[in-house]
Amino acid sequence: MTGKEIRAQFFKFFEERGHTVVESSNLIPRNDPTLLFTNAGMNQFKDVFLGLEKRDYVRACSSQKCVRAGGKHNDLENVGRTARHHTFFEMLGNFSFGDYFKKEAIAFAWEFLTKELKLDKDRLYVTVYTDDDEAADIWNRQEGVPLERIYRFGEKDNFWSMGDTGPCGPCTEIFWDNGPGTGCGSPTCEVGCDCDRYMEIWNNVFMQFNRDAQGNLTPLPKPSVDTGMGLERISTVMQGVTSNYDTDLLQGIIKHVEKLSGKRYRQDERDDVSMRVIADHSRAITFLICDGILPSNEGRGYVLRRIMRRAARHAKMLGFAEPALYRIVDAVNTMMGDAYPELLEREEYIKKVIHAEEERFIETLDRGLAILNEEVAALKKEGKSVVPGEVIFKLYDTYGFPVDLTADIVENEGFTIDEDGFALCMERQRLQARENWKGSGEEGLAEIYKTLHGRGIRSAFVGYSEQTAYSAITAILREGAEVAEAVAGEMVEVVVDTTPFYGASGGQAGDTGVISTGSAHLRVVATSKPFPDLTVHRALVTEGTVKAGDAADLRVATEVRGATARNHTATHLLQSALRQVLGEHVKQAGSLVTAERLRFDFTHFSAMTVEELRRVENIVNTYVMDNADVKSLEMAATEAMQSGATALFGEKYGDRVRVVKVGEVSSELCGGTHVRAAGDIGFFKIVGEAGIAAGVRRIEALTGSGALEYVQQLEDEQRSIAVLVKAEGGTALDKVDRLLARQKELQREVEALQARLNASRSADLLAGARETNGIKVLAAKVEMDDPKGLRELADSLKDRLQSGVIVIGCVSAGKANLLVAVTKDLSDRLRAGDIIKSLAPIIGGSGGGKPELAQAGGTKPENLDEALEAAYKIIG
């Protein structure tokens, strides 16, 4: 039975039993900053278990794409070396939200395994939480599992939680006996042994509690069920193999690697590890990029980069000299594209991101090798033969060098590596990374917001049609705590039952404005939305005393709202124009819409040309002049997708969505505020385009009066330039061209004069050359305003000296400058870099360079003569 068939059979089984098949969520957890990546099927249902979200169903099943490569769940270093560790895997799961509980969940699991998949009951074992007599009794009495095949374990093994906080509860696990030939051989080997004989295939978690940051357990509103069965593991059972890498899910990728590398799997263990690493990592890389993560030096992007570099290093070990990982995407998509069609839609984009990162790593690898070679040479001089752990860690962390690659390289030189020192550095990094993640500012929703929401406090938003509202203040917050009142001068957060203020979300800044009561006046400086139905107004009490329960008059700052709306609608038009000009691969990667400007990040692999930018700008302004109506419609999410509306990839939408349409040129899922007609935008002007990450570009633009002021400023600058160059009318450009041509002509004359001057200087300076130990040495101070001229002078002196060492210096802008040049015939004995390192401290500086040329600068010009004289002693 193939992996695809198992997945399909799982869905069919549970759908027939009243479960709704739910699509896998994005690998970036939505509204859950406690998680680095989605790592379990229940992640997308967390708020449902907590009672914060309601769905149209109480039974669900899914096949969730998961990544474990960072934080609490970090399997990266084991991947490729064991039969079961992965960075990417699929988790089959069935869920009950306050519907069925232990009795039904256990029955479903047992029936699916023993009747649908027809597994041998005698090879199945179960575990329960040590105190969960109920689950043990169900297994024994209801399903007929003998007591000797029911094991009890403590909290470490059979009490499940998603993270440090969140839903949790006792669990029961089902194990498959792979047979004595796969185990440790110990006569006491049983379920719970660390060997490969007994393999966990299904975990049923009985969600009864919520664990808070203090570790306290509180009952969930309704007991629920969360189960997880790894598709890779159950595939090994159904296909009669003992390694996940021998299943069809990964063998197709491994065979593709065989074809590209010319090597055979199962012929060399080192090659086998590399092939398994590439097979696993290619899946993780492909899915992570598809879900909107790009390689970077922080957060999720850094984890992706580490995975990519580890895979690229193993590709190099297999003999690939050029980028190869991007060529594995085809095999991944062949295997996974049916279940996850988004892979096929973004295939070219994914390949380009991988190829760009591979090229970057190949360059990094070469730089790392140069550093390692220098370190080995220095250690040899000191008579040492062990590369320090700090050096190994630097190569690993900064240049992506794995430890075994470093060990292989230095072994040829008779060196070993300090593995203990490296392990210590790694542990320090792990501890620091954990602290950085906890303190990154991405903590969960403030507890006070959760408390208010839990009490049923809500805010009805009327801002699409109204910019004023009469309401009642339901809560006042100050410094994270609820208060009864606030007085003038205090900054507070105000919650009302009805508001026209838009809370910041979807890249759009929140509204500003005023709130007035009978006894107070507040200036709203920002508006946020911690929950979809809870709006919080951050405001300064400017006069009087405001109290919870007061009636309030709310007024949005209309000019700010209007400017923001212009920029937001223009952002939609910009995306449409970009796709016309650059292609359908353009996807939104982020945005920021404020009253002042708009910023739009999108997927594209090269800087836009002036012509492309002009075309995009013209298309948007054509849309504006056409003045199409802007309409917003509410509809079912499925209907919106079928209509072709653009959605932000990876965003989680409810069953009902809002679609904003601009004539026939743009249709997007959007909850923001917009103008009524495209003509209200007035004028659109792009003011910047740049790259912000591999495969991501950013455009900044202005609209309306902001765009007009920008153009007027450019005109003012143009007129000022015309005045400066004394140009008449529209001839400024011609005048500047003539000035630049004259400048080049003068520069050539200066260079010719400088060459003659250097020739004259050279003759005079060479007269002062001394011979030291058979080597001609010229050390001299010269008068020179620009130290860049030292190199030209040195070249002239080398030509005349033919064989020797030149040390020249000058004082420029209050600083000392030194240059050392060694003729080629002597560079194997005397290195310019070594000489400059000895001289630089004398002038209060540092320097370096190549064997034949090196430079230094320092803050002690008064010591320049001393440094020049010291050159004779150093060389002698």
Curated annotation (Swiss-Prot):
It is found in: Cytoplasm. GO terms for cellular component: cytosol. It catalyses: tRNA(Ala) + L-alanine + ATP = L-alanyl-tRNA(Ala) + AMP + diphosphate. The keyword Membrane does not apply. SUPFAM superfamilies: Class II aaRS and biotin synthetases, Putative anticodon-binding domain of alanyl-tRNA synthetase (AlaRS), ThrRS/AlaRS common domain, Translation proteins. Its EC number is 6.1.1.7. Pfam families: DHHA1, tRNA-synt_2c, tRNA_SAD. Keywords: Aminoacyl-tRNA synthetase, ATP-binding, Cytoplasm, Ligase, Metal-binding, Nucleotide-binding, Protein biosynthesis, RNA-binding, tRNA-binding, Zinc. Zn(2+) binds at H568, H572, C670, H674. It is an enzyme of class 6 (ligase). SMART domains: tRNA_SAD (SM00863). One of its GO terms (biological process) is negative regulation of DNA-templated transcription. Its cofactor is Zn(2+). GO terms for molecular function: alanine-tRNA ligase activity; aminoacyl-tRNA deacylase activity; ATP binding; tRNA binding; zinc ion binding. Binds 1 zinc ion per subunit. Its main location: cytoplasm. InterPro entries: aa-tRNA-synth_II/BPL/LPL, Ala-tRNA-lgiase_IIc, Ala-tRNA-ligase_IIc_anticod-bd, Ala-tRNA-synth_IIc_core, Ala-tRNA-synth_IIc_N, Ala-tRNA_ligase, Ala_tRNA_ligase_euk/bac, DHHA1_dom. NCBIfam families: alaS. Catalyzes the attachment of alanine to tRNA(Ala) in a two-step reaction: alanine is first activated by ATP to form Ala-AMP and then transferred to the acceptor end of tRNA(Ala). Also edits incorrectly charged Ser-tRNA(Ala) and Gly-tRNA(Ala) via its editing domain. Consists of three domains; the N-terminal catalytic domain, the editing domain and the C-terminal C-Ala domain. The editing domain removes incorrectly charged amino acids, while the C-Ala domain, along with tRNA(Ala), serves as a bridge to cooperatively bring together the editing and aminoacylation centers thus stimulating deacylation of misacylated tRNAs. PANTHER family: ALANINE--TRNA LIGASE, CYTOPLASMIC, ALANYL-TRNA SYNTHETASE. Belongs to the class-II aminoacyl-tRNA synthetase family. This is Alanine--tRNA ligase. It comes from Geotalea uraniireducens (strain Rf4) (Geobacter uraniireducens). The lineage of its organism: Bacteria, Pseudomonadati, Thermodesulfobacteriota, Desulfuromonadia, Geobacterales.
